[in-house]
């Protein structure tokens, strides 16, 4: 595993942890980006959206894009 791959995995894990503690297990991607940065995982919005799409494809989250920001909810 190279460094970039490790950082992508860390971003996905931190996003899931943030959602697990969010009200209704839901947050906007902009909020997730700030939480990740506060946890020391600096990620560009475009990169975060790619990782959120990956989590969606794997069935871990459900993403919705009503208007600009992407809403993310842990899949149940």
What residues fall within each predicted segment?
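Short, cationic-aromatic polyanion-contact patches
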Residues: 66-76
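Carbohydrate-binding/catalytic loop surfaces
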Residues: 39
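A short glycine/small-residue-enriched secondary-structure motif
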Residues: 32, 51-55, 69
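Short acidic, hydrophobic short linear motifs in intrinsically disordered regions
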Residues: 25-36
């Amino acid at each position: 595993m190279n460094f970039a791959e490790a950082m992508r995995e860390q971003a996905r894990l931190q996003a899931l942890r943030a959602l697990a503690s969010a009200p209704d297990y839901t947050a906007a991607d902009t909020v997730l980006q700030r939480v990740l940065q506060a946890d020391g995982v600096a990620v560009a919005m475009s990169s975060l959206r790619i990782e959120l799409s990956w989590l969606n494809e794997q069935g871990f989250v459900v993403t919705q894009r009503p208007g600009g920001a992407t809403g993310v909810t842990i899949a149940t």
